[in-house]
Amino acid sequence: MIRKSIFAVVLSLLLFIQCNTNTDFVIAKDQVGKLMKSNTIDDIETVFASDSIVRDTAITRIGTAVKKINIYEKGGKHLLALTPNMDSIPKIEIIRIYDPRYVTEKGVGLNSTFKDIKDKHSIKKIITALNNVVIFLKDSDAYFTIAKTELPSNLQYGNNTDIEAVQIPDKAKIKYMMVGWE
């Protein structure tokens, strides 16, 4: 009888722990961890109250404009870089992910490879830049940059070559992970 009671308690605890997932580092539709697409720049102090916020500002004729906001954990680990838009009520437009704990709902993050991206997400398009390849997803606001040095040598030079998903090696590492909110 005691065994059944202990078993029931342990099972209940396991179910409770399993259901209590931490979303502080999940990238979902209109959300990056604690940050929501609807948050304004003024909300940043509240959203990241337990973290360090560093604002990179520029002085203009009409006042001070925030160019970039860096978010650090209290221990000094760089989490995010936020770039606001220039609206009258500025919101976040671009987020650069620095911390590998941030992953998409399907588990793709900075420590993932191109194989992880193509296996877990639908690729919308691939844009070739001078030194990088940018991969946009259909099902997420996140996009990934892979350095051309990860590609075969015949694709590394020149930006006029359109690169397709089949040409990118499965083991290609992610250089940057970004989220774009327009």
Regions found by a protein language model. Name each.
Residues 135:
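Mixed-charge (Asp/Glu-Lys/Arg
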Residues 1-26:
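Bacterial Sec-dependent N-terminal signal peptides
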Residues 19-130, 139-140, 158-182:
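Short helix/turn-capping signatures at newly exposed starts of structured segments
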Residues 153-157:
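Short, solvent-exposed loop/beta-turn-alpha elements that line the ligand-binding surface or hinge
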Residues 145-150:
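Positively charged
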